[in-house]
């Protein structure tokens, strides 16, 4: 299982003083050197953490895979077509939220989504959709032309008690299997950390986990290479 590192909160820390450091690009390079298989960043409409210049520099600097999380807007589509990350992950976005709160409502936006994905695919950009681990969302993602789905693991990360944890884990396991059967690659993310990631070693249909906040929070205390190695130790099969 691969680890993709979300560097948004390196930018959050930098923006607290607007003095240019810590640099998200420097962090991305260090993450790659420490074993990350990809770098994730979310260019929000309000630019609350990652800025346009960060994205441009990341595109030039990293050697693995750049995953651009973004809303389904014409502005973001234009940016993605210009920058051409290896992967775009479409996420729902609300200005008032602290972080992405749930999966993309594909059934509500299916026609627009299909039209949005096509030019990205035509220009060599793979497309993932951040969804709840539900059968209908997976089927619609495949029909819309996505290459991948990222399963929302927030409910799992917030689950308490063995019964609820097992229930949420089984939802993810089943969704991952259905997605693979539909021809989609599978990523999982949101709220994952060294404290809850170990069971994912047994979810063989999931190829990659995307982790940001917990990893960066740990890195503040022990350093980014150590924080990444701790996670890699927990997900190695």
Curated annotation (Swiss-Prot):
It is found in: Cytoplasm. 3-amino-2-oxopropyl phosphate binds at residues 6, 17, 191, 212-213. The keyword Cytoplasm applies. Keywords: Cytoplasm, Pyridoxine biosynthesis, Transferase. One of its GO terms (cellular component) is cytosol. Gene3D superfamilies: Aldolase class I (3.20.20.70). It comes from the Bacteria. It catalyses: 3-amino-2-oxopropyl phosphate + 1-deoxy-D-xylulose 5-phosphate = pyridoxine 5'-phosphate + phosphate + 2 H2O + H(+). The keyword Cytoplasm applies. InterPro entries: Aldolase_TIM (IPR013785), PyrdxlP_synth_PdxJ (IPR004569), Pyridoxine-5'_phos_synth (IPR036130). The active site is at 42 (proton acceptor), 69 (proton acceptor), 190 (proton donor). Pathway: Cofactor biosynthesis; pyridoxine 5'-phosphate biosynthesis; pyridoxine 5'-phosphate from D-erythrose 4-phosphate: step 5/5. 1-deoxy-D-xylulose 5-phosphate binds at residues 8-9, 44, 49, 99. Its main location: cytoplasm. One of its GO terms (biological process) is pyridoxine biosynthetic process. One of its GO terms (molecular function) is pyridoxine 5'-phosphate synthase activity. HAMAP family: PdxJ. Belongs to the PNP synthase family. Homooctamer; tetramer of dimers. This is Pyridoxine 5'-phosphate synthase. It comes from Chlorobaculum parvum (strain DSM 263 / NCIMB 8327) (Chlorobium vibrioforme subsp. thiosulfatophilum).
